[in-house]
């Protein structure tokens, strides 16, 4: 049934002469024809152009893919924000096997830039009142991957630093020329509100916060992760800093429930390999003393697994 029907605007059988101005497109006068039937009322329902049909089909495909992507993002958001959510993301994105931490390294020149023979020196300012245990763990792991020239200093504004913090890197006996090392790691005990890292004044800004510095240092191991795992790792690091370390008691209880659920499925927080999420969460738990009797069984088992590793065990001695 047509939406509307146009009636003739004049009566009579005689043709109507209309003076038309000069225009770009001229159309035949539909009222000038005689003896022919009136145009069909459903003339607007003619067959569509094939190119238009193809365009509409392509648009439908794009909308369908957008709906699927939106559903995937909504599912990931629910899983990250809800501690007790049980969502199987393997159906959303096929996860690749992560590279083993002990066997993969990266080209430091590609990661940190070519310094034409100069030693790549990472300088970290940390407050001795709150030693960043995660960075000490990562330092030990870096020493297992690269030739690291380590040194510890005390800023002149700091009156005293415990002896164990001054020896946090162990006895440093430099037996090789400086240029034969691959990486420099300098720790300065300084009265700063947040842990700071400076690498290259010319090419990068200082990085602040234990979690952000840990992310940078862990990237030097070259561990490969898929997009889903990378999102989960970043989420765990943020949870450690903003909820477990600075949050209320309810937020901390929610973090423990979420950790207990994740560790009930895999030995580490994200998959079967140690990640920066494990390092930072372990560090925050030890700094805040939140690993006592209130921790669930899976979390306590995970804590013990961390401290069975030499880098964690060495860092733990600094709190004794």
Curated annotation (Swiss-Prot):
Gene Ontology cellular-component terms listed: aminoacyl-tRNA synthetase multienzyme complex; cytosol; nucleus
Keyword Cytoplasm among record annotations: yes
InterPro entries linked to this entry: AIMP2, AIMP2_LysRS-bd, AIMP2_thioredoxin, Glutathione-S-Trfase_C_sf, GST_C
Domain GST C-terminal: 220-317
GO terms, molecular function: molecular adaptor activity
Domain of life: Eukaryota
Description of post-translational modifications: Phosphorylated on serine residues in response to UV irradiation.
Region of interest (Interaction with PRKN), ranges: 82-162
Subcellular location: Cytoplasm, Cytosol; Nucleus
Annotated region described as Interaction with TP53, given as residue ranges: 162-225
Any one GO biological process: protein ubiquitination
Phosphoserine found at: 36
Entry coiled-coil feature ranges: none
Alphabetically ordered keywords of this record: Apoptosis, Cytoplasm, Developmental protein, Differentiation, Nucleus, Phosphoprotein, Protein biosynthesis, Ubl conjugation
Cited function: Required for assembly and stability of the aminoacyl-tRNA synthase complex. Mediates ubiquitination and degradation of FUBP1, a transcriptional activator of MYC, leading to MYC down-regulation which is required for aveolar type II cell differentiation. Blocks MDM2-mediated ubiquitination and degradation of p53/TP53. Functions as a proapoptotic factor.
Subunit structure of this chain's protein: Part of the multisynthetase complex (MSC), a multisubunit complex that groups tRNA ligases for Arg (RARS1), Asp (DARS1), Gln (QARS1), Ile (IARS1), Leu (LARS1), Lys (KARS1), Met (MARS1) the bifunctional ligase for Glu and Pro (EPRS1) and the auxiliary subunits AIMP1/p43, AIMP2/p38 and EEF1E1/p18. Interacts (via N-terminus) with KARS1. Interacts with EPRS1. Forms a linear complex that contains MARS1, EEF1E1, EPRS1 and AIMP2 that is at the core of the multisubunit complex. Binds FUBP1 (via C-terminus).
Name of the protein this chain belongs to: Aminoacyl tRNA synthase complex-interacting multifunctional protein 2
Organism for this UniProt entry: Bos taurus
Lineage: Eukaryota, Metazoa, Chordata, Craniata, Vertebrata
């Amino acid at each position: 049934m047509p939406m509307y029907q146009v009636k003739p605007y004049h009566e009579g059988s005689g043709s109507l002469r209309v003076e038309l101005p000069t225009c770009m497109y001229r159309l035949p006068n539909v009222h000038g024809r005689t003896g022919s039937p009136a145009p069909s009322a459903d003339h607007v329902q003619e067959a569509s152009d094939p190119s238009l049909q193809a365009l509409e089909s392509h648009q439908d495909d794009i909308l369908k893919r957008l709906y699927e992507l939106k559903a995937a993002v909504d599912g990931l958001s629910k899983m990250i924000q809800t501690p007790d959510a049980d969502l199987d993301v393997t159906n959303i994105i096929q996860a690749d096997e992560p590279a083993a931490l002990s066997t993969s390294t990266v080209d430091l020149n590609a990661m940190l830039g070519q310094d034409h023979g100069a030693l790549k020196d990472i300088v970290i300012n940390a407050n001795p009142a709150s030693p960043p245990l995660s960075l000490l763990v990562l330092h030990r792991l870096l020493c297992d991957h690269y030739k690291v020239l380590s040194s510890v200093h005390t800023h002149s504004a700091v009156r005293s630093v415990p002896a164990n913090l001054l020896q946090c890197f162990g006895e440093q006996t430099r037996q090789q020329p400086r240029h034969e090392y691959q990486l420099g790691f300098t720790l300065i005990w300084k009265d700063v509100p947040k842990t700071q890292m400076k690498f290259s004044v010319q090419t990068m800004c200082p990085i602040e916060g234990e979690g952000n510095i840990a992310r940078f240092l862990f990237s030097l191991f070259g561990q490969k992760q898929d997009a889903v795992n990378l999102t989960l790792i970043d989420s765990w690091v943020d949870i450690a800093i903003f909820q477990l370390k600075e949050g209320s008691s309810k937020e901390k209880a929610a973090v423990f429930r979420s950790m207990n659920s994740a560790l009930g499925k895999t030995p580490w927080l994200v998959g079967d390999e140690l990640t920066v999420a494990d390092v930072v969460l372990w560090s925050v738990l030890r700094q805040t003393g939140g690993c006592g009797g209130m921790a669930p069984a899976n979390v306590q088992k995970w804590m013990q697994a961390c401290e069975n590793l030499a880098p964690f065990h060495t860092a733990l001695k600094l709190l004794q």
